[in-house]
Regions:
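Beta-strand-loop-alpha-helix segment that lines the small-molecule cofactor/substrate pocket
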Residues: 119, 131-182, 196, 392
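C-terminal helical cap and adjacent loop that interface with cofactors, partners, or active-site loops
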Residues: 28-37, 65, 244, 248-261, ...
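N-terminal Rossmann-fold NAD(P) dinucleotide-binding loop
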Residues: 63-64, 130
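N-terminal secretory signal peptides and thylakoid transit peptides that target proteins
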Residues: 5-33
Length: 416
């Protein structure tokens, strides 16, 4: 499978992201939450008039789980599925009552789903493949729902930006599935931040700690990496742990900052036992913003019994915000605070709200696609951190945007 060709127009358009004002960034982030928090009753209307034909590409783990939810959703009808592995495609297809002739496999199974004339497509494959898949879906006139991160390198990320903007121009919906931006406690806390409850920000700290995924020995092909999230251990397939996992926390930090960083420095290493693939799993990154705000991001992914925890702390001159993925979000201050609350089921609830929002956008013609630019910015920020650590020096945002190098995979021997 070839990567999408480079488009020189993307560089100018992406550079605009670095010069957007704080107000524009916050407005985009705020609108990203509005669409996802509407009543399902408003979203669905008449089932006969709003049922959308859908295809799901990537059916292992989260992809299969999302496919089951979409199949039960009153607004969608799954008419095609695809997975690299034919047995996975057929097993899920049988469970969802998809005809055998519409259960596709191989690297190009996504194209068969698109060619089956679905209205919408859900992309849940390793992110290396997202730019090509999303571009093909948008060119075919499909609405696109995709996982994060949006890509594994800068050219791929900018390709997603262009595909998303093309969707908007074509009056189609393009949604990236970040769960925290749908959480009512995060939304309310961020509204209070905009109103000034924290005062001037001094420090942001984001973090993500969890165990690593299975890291199988290398084989004759990379097929063994396409199962059980093993691809997260491969930088080209999954972007590396900082891009694939830490992005949840980094995205919240950017949401709070209302801007993108101007530079990053950092360190990273591989500490998981018997590492077979190249992704680093321990990171300590420092980001700087143009207004002097400092942000640190730290994470580790080793099987050492550490319980999952991810979130962000924001320290201002008047108060401190604590925002946890699946935990409590609150603000403590010298004058004012916010009791907030917990969202222990955010992983599932966030997905459900995003699927509802995707359907609502399709049937109501809401195609401003507010999740696009925040998701692109979050991906670029994690790429900035990854590259600063790998290069062992300071890397600026502008340096990053000039990076035309694509991460390449040897797809020899894989089923097309």
């Amino acid at each position: 499978m070839n990567r999408p060709p480079s488009n020189p127009n993307l560089r100018t358009r992406a550079t605009a992201l670095s010069s957007r004002s704080r107000r524009e960034f916050i407005a985009s982030s705020a609108s990203a939450t509005v669409l996802t928090f509407m009543s399902p009753a408003l979203a669905f209307g008449s089932e006969a008039n709003s049922r959308v034909t859908a295809g799901v590409v990537g059916l292992g783990g989260r992809g299969g789980w999302i496919a089951e939810h979409v199949a039960q959703h009153p607004g969608f009808h799954i008419t095609a599925v695809a997975d690299y592995f034919p047995e996975v495609a057929h097993n899920v297809g049988e469970k969802l009552k998809v005809p055998k002739e519409r259960c596709f496999s191989g690297l190009n199974g996504y194209r068969s789903v698109i060619d089956s004339k679905v209205d919408a497509i859900f992309l849940e494959t390793p992110p290396y493949f997202f730019p090509q898949q999303a571009r093909a879906a948008v060119e075919a006139g499909c609405h696109v729902y995709m996982a994060k991160p949006v890509a594994v390198d800068v050219p791929g990320t900018l390709s997603i930006l262009e595909s998303g903007r093309k969707s908007t121009r074509n009056r189609k919906v393009f949604l990236v599935d970040f769960q925290t931006r749908t959480d009512p406690f995060h939304i309310e806390a961020l509204q209070k931040v905009r109103e000034g409850i924290l005062g001037k920000l001094g420090l942001l700290t984001s973090f993500y700690h969890d165990e690593c995924f299975a890291d199988p020995p290398k084989g004759k092909t990379i097929e063994h990496l396409l199962r059980n999230l093993a691809w997260v251990n491969d930088t080209a397939l999954g972007g590396a742990y900082i891009v694939n996992c830490d992005i949840h926390a980094v995205d919240v930090a950017l949401w709070i900052a209302g801007d993108v960083p101007v530079s990053a420095v950092g360190y990273s290493s591989r500490k998981r036992p018997n590492a077979q693939n190249d992704s680093h799993d321990c990171y300590a990154i420092s980001f700087q913003f143009k207004d002097g705000l400092v942000m640190t991001d730290h994470s580790e992914h080793i099987r050492n019994g550490t319980p999952f925890k991810s979130g962000c702390y924001a320290y201002g001159e008047k108060a401190c915000l604590e925002a946890h993925y699946g935990g409590k979000t609150s603000i403590r201050g010298v004058e004012d605070g916010y009791a907030g609350g917990e969202s222990p089921e955010l992983y599932a609830e966030g997905m459900r709200r995003n699927v509802d929002a995707f359907h609502q956008g399709i049937v109501e013609g809401k195609h401003d696609n507010p999740t696009l630019e925040p998701s692109v910015n979050a991906t670029l920020a994690t790429l900035l951190g990854r590259e600063a650590a790998l290069r062992g020096r300071k890397v600026t945002w502008e340096d990053l945007l000039q990076d035309t190098a694509r991460l390449e995979l040897d797809l020899t021997g894989l089923k097309v």
